[in-house]
Each structure stands twice: as structure tokens, then as C-alpha cells.
Amino acid sequence: MSDQNALTPRVLIVRHGETEWSKSGRSTSFTEVDLTAAGAAQVSSAAAVLVGSGKLIDPCKVAHVFVSPRKRAETTLDLLLPPSSDISKEKITFTEDITEWNYGDYEGKTSEEIRRLREDKGWDKEQEWTVWSDGCEGGE
């Protein structure tokens, strides 16, 4: 049996296409930022390769889709799985449970700007700040 016909359930995670903020390195969580034209093209290109009968994402075999309620994620869904793909609205759940983490006070700032802010507060003298080890002031 080919992998495409396997009975094992699959979970696929798709990130939204490029936004102006992701393009410029700005931290984005709760702010509504639309896809750029390039971001929309990224998703459309991925859809052409990944979505369709016999492809990795076969709309007839999709059991459920979970989507962040951010506009960029909704637009990505619409480009990846358009209404013509026959996925019923009942199979789509918009949920805050899969939103990007909260950047708090660092929302909209670049890593360089965040490091400067933290330096001004006298923080990170031992090692340079990273979002992974030090988190976000006022966020996660």
C-alpha cells in the first residue's frame, strides 16, 4: 500500500505566508497583519504542489482543520483549501488554542530593538537575550 493510501492518521501543520512584519523581522502575535503579495504567492504555490486528489493533502480525506483566527491564517486557509475544495465548514474550527505565542511588550519590535530595550534596563549582561530562553516581557 502506498503511503498516500495508508490508514494512519496524519497531522499537518501549515504556517501562514509572508506578512510585512515577518518580512521585516517584527515579532507578531495578536496584531492583525495581512499577507503580502509574495506571501499569497507562497501559499498558492504550495497549494498547487500539495493539495489535490492523490496529493499530500487530498481534500476528500481531510477529517478536520484547525485554524488560528488571525486574518493571515484565514487567508492562508482560503488560498490553500478554497471553498471549491469541498471541505465543509463543519470541518473547520477557528481557535485561539493555536495562535502564535504572545510577544507582549515586544509585539511589533525586531530582535535588535528588543535587545536594546533590555540593555537599557540593565538586563542580559551575562548572555544575550533570546525569545526561547528568556521569553517576552508582558507576554509568554
Question: What is each PLM-predicted segment?
Answer:
Residues 3-87:
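Active-site-proximal alpha-helix that buttresses catalytic centers in soluble enzyme cores
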Residues 83-140:
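Phosphate-handling substructures
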